[in-house]
């Protein structure tokens, strides 16, 4: 990707080179075909050159055509109005070319980022899991024998260890007569390994007579319960906020919240795209920061300069409770531990503004009974206090409940009390509680 980024380099010039190019183009078209060219340039070259430079600078400042003509920057030229018109046209072409070339550079940057992303995915596949069949030969044989007693034939079984020292078991199995629950095989593996295990997300419930691939993971320590409350802007038909909550086989739970610019259908479509891209990238195996970069580059190349969306991504490792947050133009997040609330903020531009978006990861540790509260800007912005983040933190702290749904609804209700019940922007409140199994 480094070599790819280096191809070509920038072909656009600084301000002085831009002036020279415009000057050369204008004089090449008008002066070269003018009968008075020799008189003007031989007798008054220094003066004429300075006057044309002043006119060119006015064009670059985007002054109006009539204003430039009235200022008479070039006093001795009978074709001065035509010269101004030609300079404006030439500058317009130069700006268009510059914009298109920037898009090409952005495309090249995106492709380089995609190459980097694919490299990371391949590296993760190479180093994330290590085959340990040799050290698990006895366990593999016992699982095959135990499964056979349950009517399950095991064709292949392999043990892997992740970089976090967790066990993954992959197998090809079938039921001789069909109709055996796959959980029977899970119980066989738990009995032999002495570990608490779980099946992959997309796993058949009943084994058939055909071979089926089954992957088993070490079970996680925590589970989550979630709640959602929201209101659309009073003058809108639909909320411009979107969110998604999903877990992965690797034992992570992801919450993705996006607030589209403005409100209504356009904002909804933009935030929906952000959430959809993030979910697909993460489920495809990309790390969260890489997924954010790919999503951002897609939004930049979408090419709509006034269409941006925020991204608030929280990922919880259900093995150890580690929380990782990435905020792209998003509102503050609140972590509630009993009656104490921690406010997490980050300043960054919304998605789609800059192709080289800075990605900052914020990490916290969650414990049994903690709540994560994520909101969009509409929940905070219209609290009529000097520090709305602290006000919302106090609201969350005062609520006593172990129910995520109740927490999210009470937060929204109390915010609406502060705004007099009027919803001036789309409001979304997500509450995620983490509990030990």
Predicted regions and their residues:
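A short interface-forming secondary-structure element
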Residues: 169-178, 330
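Catalytic core of PPM/PP2C metal-dependent serine/threonine phosphatase domains
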Residues: 131-164, 184-186, 190-211, 268-338, ...
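Active-site-proximal, acidic helix/loop segment immediately C-terminal to a metal-coordinating Asp/Glu
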Residues: 260-284, 347-348, 366, 370-419
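N-terminal entry segment of metal-dependent catalytic domains or homologous docking segments
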Residues: 205-260, 266, 272-273
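Short beta-strand-to-coil "C-cap" segments at the C-terminal boundary of structured domains/repeats
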Residues: 217-219, 432-437
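PP2C/PPM family metal-dependent serine/threonine protein phosphatase catalytic domain
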Residues: 218-242, 296-302, 331-363, 413-417
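Intracellular, membrane-proximal regulatory regions of polytopic membrane proteins
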Residues: 1-141
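Acidic loop->beta-strand submotif enriched in PP2C/PPM serine/threonine phosphatases
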Residues: 236-252, 311, 343-384, 420-421
């Amino acid at each position: 990707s480094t070599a790819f980024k280096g191809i070509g380099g920038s072909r656009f010039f600084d301000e002085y080179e831009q002036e020279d190019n415009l000057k050369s183009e204008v004089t090449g078209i008008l002066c070269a075909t003018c009968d008075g060219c020799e008189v003007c340039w031989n007798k008054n070259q220094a003066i004429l050159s300075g006057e044309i430079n002043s006119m060119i600078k006015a064009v670059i400042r985007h002054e109006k055509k009539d204003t430039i003509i009235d200022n008479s920057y070039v006093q001795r030229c009978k074709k001065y109005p035509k010269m101004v018109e030609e300079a404006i046209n030439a500058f317009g072409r130069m700006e268009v070319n510059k914009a298109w070339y920037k898009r090409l550079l952005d495309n090249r940057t995106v492709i380089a980022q995609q190459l980097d992303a694919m490299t990371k995915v391949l590296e993760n596949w190479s180093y994330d899991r290590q085959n340990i069949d040799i050290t698990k030969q006895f366990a593999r044989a016992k699982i095959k024998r135990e499964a056979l007693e349950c009517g399950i034939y095991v064709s292949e079984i392999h043990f892997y260890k992740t970089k976090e020292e967790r066990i993954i078991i992959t197998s090809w199995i079938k039921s001789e007569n069909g109709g055996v629950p796959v959980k029977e095989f899970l119980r066989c593996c738990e009995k032999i390994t002495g570990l608490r295990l779980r099946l992959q997300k997309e796993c058949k419930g009943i084994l058939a007579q055909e071979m089926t691939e089954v992957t088993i993971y070490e079970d996680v320590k925590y589970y989550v319960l979630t709640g959602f409350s929201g209101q659309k802007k009073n003058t809108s038909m639909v909320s411009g906020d979107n969110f998604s909550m999903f877990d992965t086989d690797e034992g992570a739970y992801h919450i993705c919240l996006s607030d589209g610019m403005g409100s209504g259908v356009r904002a909804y479509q933009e935030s929906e795209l952000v959430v959809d891209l993030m979910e697909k990238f993460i489920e495809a195996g990309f790390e969260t920061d890489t997924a954010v970069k790919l999503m951002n580059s897609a939004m930049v190349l979408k090419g709509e300069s006034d269409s941006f969306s925020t991204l608030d991504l929280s990922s919880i490792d259900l093995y150890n409770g580690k929380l990782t947050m990435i905020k792209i133009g998003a509102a503050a997040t609140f972590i509630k531990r009993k009656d104490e609330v921690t406010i997490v903020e980050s300043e960054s531009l919304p998605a789609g503004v800059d192709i080289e978006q800075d990605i900052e990861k914020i990490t916290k540790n969650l414990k049994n009974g903690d709540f994560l509260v994520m909101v969009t800007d509409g929940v905070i912005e219209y609290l009529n206090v000097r520090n709305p983040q602290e006000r919302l933190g106090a609201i969350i702290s005062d609520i006593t409940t172990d129910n995520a749904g109740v927490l999210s609804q009470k937060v929204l209700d109390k915010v609406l009390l502060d705004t007099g019940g009027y919803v001036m922007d789309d409001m979304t409140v997500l509450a995620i509680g983490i509990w030990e199994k």
